């Protein structure tokens, strides 16, 4: 008998994360702004694309499925080389995102997926109704969303991952399976703090939240232990900051 090959479905907006690293040694004589001299440029998948990249590393023997928007989105960050301080970001291509389309194939993918990860960056691709339907049809699911959420939207998700600011902005949520990431302090789940193994303050432009989400749900699927999965996700997220 062949071993079952795990299927992981990642749904959400993708982008290209471009980082332009610069030397910054002086102010402009024309205005009180720094002069940035580009040194090097790197590009990698961002948003749900970063989540998929993490899944590929964490579970290399799995089948990775993706449902993403058709339009190209690029986030260009100008970063000071020595300090890793980001001066500003330029976003391109996110103004005309077409909405998610339900098809028979989508239903099949949801039915076959062992894990469904929703990386919702609130760019117009997914609606509240889409989120509810995805959660209802998924076996094991986690939502990482940047929108204002309601209890009826999240009630059927196995887990919901929010950062600290997102949790503050959603005070009415009562789902017991909300995990709140706390940056350098780790994560909170059911009123218990799980400290980060690297508690120092950092400037994060690396998508550590996507890493946490993917790491947590994959480890939870393996062991069915929230505490162990959160500790593992904390370690993985700390490595990319």
Language-model features, listed with the residues they occupy:
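Generic beta-sheet signal
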Residues: 11, 65-67, 144, 163, ...
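Conserved beta-alpha-beta core of the PfkB/ribokinase-like small-molecule kinase fold
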Residues: 25-27, 31, 78-96, 115-172, ...
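Glycine-rich beta-alpha junction loops
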Residues: 14-16, 68-71, 94, 147, ...
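Short hydrophobic/aromatic-enriched beta-strand-loop microsegments
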Residues: 62-63, 158-164, 194-196
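Conserved N-terminal subdomain of the carbohydrate kinase-like
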Residues: 6-11, 16-117, 128-130
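A short acidic-Thr-Gly-centered motif at the start of a beta-strand
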Residues: 1-5
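Active-site metal-binding loops of divalent metal-dependent hydrolases
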Residues: 13-14, 121, 211
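Conserved phosphate-binding/catalytic region of the ribokinase-like
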Residues: 112, 129-140, 145-156, 169-241
């Amino acid at each position: 008998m062949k071993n079952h090959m795990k299927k992981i479905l990642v749904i959400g907006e993708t982008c290209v994360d471009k980082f332009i690293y610069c030397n910054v040694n002086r102010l402009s004589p024309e205005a009180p702004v720094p002069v940035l001299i580009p040194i090097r440029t790197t590009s990698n998948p961002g948003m749900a694309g970063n989540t998929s990249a993490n899944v590929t590393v964490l579970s290399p023997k799995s089948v990775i499925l993706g449902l993403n928007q058709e339009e190209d989105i690029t986030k260009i960050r100008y970063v000071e080389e020595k300090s890793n301080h980001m001066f500003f970001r330029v976003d391109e291509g996110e103004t005309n995102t077409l909405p998610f389309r339900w098809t028979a194939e989508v239903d099949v993918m949801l039915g076959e997926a062992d894990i469904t990860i929703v990386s919702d960056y609130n760019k117009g691709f997914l609606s509240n109704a889409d989120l509810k339907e995805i959660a209802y049809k998924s076996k094991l699911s986690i939502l990482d969303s940047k929108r204002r959420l309601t209890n009826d939207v999240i009630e059927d998700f196995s887990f919901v991952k929010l950062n600290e600011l997102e949790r503050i902005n959603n005070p009415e949520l009562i789902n017991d399976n909300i995990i709140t990431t706390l940056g350098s302090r780790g994560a909170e789940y059911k009123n218990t703090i799980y400290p980060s193994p690297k508690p120092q303050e950092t400037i994060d432009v690396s998508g550590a939240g996507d890493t946490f989400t993917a790491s947590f749900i994959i480890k939870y699927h393996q062991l069915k232990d929230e505490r162990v999965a959160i500790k593992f996700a904390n370690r993985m997220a700390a490595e990319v900051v």
